[in-house]
Every structure is written in structure tokens, then in C-alpha cells.
């Protein structure tokens, strides 16, 4: 194994989340709690007391939220007062949702790292799974085409084990827009998981003929409206299908969730699905040059349903690889089994929340503290293939 990969595995002995928790207690390391919702105060305090952590700082959103008294050893500060805290907590704990994760960059200059809220058991499960599948993970790592991919891949694995948000390595370019892996002018592109049509329009502006697939009926309507209200550029043809992509044609249940709608046998709604091989034949597509997939854990199913298309045309692909823990190796291995001549890269992105996820009031708060609208998280990991 290469030295960097070996070093990462070796470091996990002390850096994995469960061991870090033990070290925090043993060393009485100063820790903080970021309470964007003060109603969770007692929950936080109970957690810290039960875990025997050294809680030295409770940080609330604004001065008006300082409505409770500090307990022994605690400092209560508003976010804008955090610079005055001494000693600074080494780690900040947060609870629930994406909103508190946005403040990673605010705490970072003060030397305070942030745990993202997946919990001890989740991180331990990831660690156990990764250790079980080290040969597969190492194989993927070694097959990545550039050093940046390897660094991003190791960082992604590492952060999932440490549960430290700062350990991720986020790419600078817009998601799906890695140079060399984009649809070109005249390409036939598949947008699997079109959501609101934004990526469909982006690909059309590259000059591609785009076929977008969205199983959620409400999202499908939003796609149509967005495309009607936008110049997709170059007079390029865009088709939006109210279909999900899968390994076969049929009807299945799904659980609605805006950007997170996913197939679920216990789901409350139903949608029609189709495999890409059947769709391409039925629509007489002369070829497929590009595929983007973000379909909430159904990526491997879809790839099985596109096996003939991928084998025949070797399209460039951008495949989301974070919905299932095993995506880091199963997606890679399957694509490699279809075409051994694929080149692979890996990137991890912040969530673009410019017009998504947060409301105007929350965005105003981000601006006040000099933060972007891009949310750091464990989501948005992408395998690129060409």
C-alpha cells in the first residue's frame, strides 16, 4: 500500500471518533456547544455530563439568546463574542440539520474544529465497514488518475471515521463541472435526478442535447417551469421525463423529500421507472455521450440498467457516491467491470445553497458573519469517469 493510505489507516487508531471521545475525557480538553436553538440547551448539557466532557463554552446565535445562567466552568457567549472566549474550545459540538454546519468556517480561524452530527455509533459503523473493505477501498484509491483525487478520497474516508467536518477536502469548482468531464457541444447527455432542472440547463448551455429524468411529480413540474423560464443556450434541445432511472422498467413506490426523494417499498407515492438501455432504444438515441447521476442511492441500480449503453459508448459520467456507505467501491467496481479503460477521478463538494435549503433570514445571518451560501457536509461526493 502507498505510504499516505497506510498512514491514514494507522492514524485511525487515535483519530477515529470513538477514540477521540475517550481522549477528550481523559485530557479534559476544552469543548464547546454551538446552540443555534436554545431549546436544546438541557439536551446538550445532559449529553456533556453523561459523556464527562469538559464543557467550557456554550455559543448561541445572538446576545438576546443568552437567557440562561452558566454552570460551573462554562462561558456563555453570542456568536459575535466568540473571539473573546479563553480558552478556545478545541472542538465544537452541534446538533441537527445543515444550518449549524455553515459556521465551520467561522470557528476555523480560532482553531476550533466542528464535529458533524452523525454520532458515535454511526462513525464506528463506518470505521468497521471501511476496515472490512480496505482492499476494495485501496484498489479504488490506487486507480484514481490524479493526486488531487487521491487526497480528496482519503480525506473523505478520514472525515467519515473522525466525524470532524474540517477533515473533508472540498473542491473549488462547481459540482459536476470538473474540467475534462463535461458534456461537449453536440453531445447527448443524461441528467439522472434532475430535481429542479438547474443541472439540466447547465448541461444544455454546454451545447448538449439533454434528457433529464425526475421521478418526483412536483419536482418534474418545477423542472418544466424552470426550463420554460430560462434560455438554455444555443437553441439546444431539452427533454424532461417524469421517470426514475433504474435497472428495469416498471412502477415502484418512493418517499418524497424534495431534493431527497428516493425509492422506498414503504413509500407513500408511486412513480414510473425505466432502464437507460430500454429508453435509449425506444427513443432511437444514436449514442449517449454523458451521464450525471444523483438519484438518492439508486445509482448502482441505474448503472446495471445502463450496462449496454455504457459498454457500447463509454460516456463520460459524474456519479454521486455518498448515499450509501459502500458506494465508494461498489460504483467504481461495477463501472470498471463494464469498461476497463475508464479513467476515474474523485471530488467532494459543498452543497450549493444559493437558492436551496435555507431561507432568506438564514442567508442574512450568513452574510452578517461573512459566510458563503455553500454548506460543508458529508454529502456531494462524486466519481468522475471518462
Model-assigned labels for residue ranges:
Residues 1-57, 61-386:
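Phosphate/nucleotide-binding beta-alpha loop and adjacent structural elements of enzyme active sites
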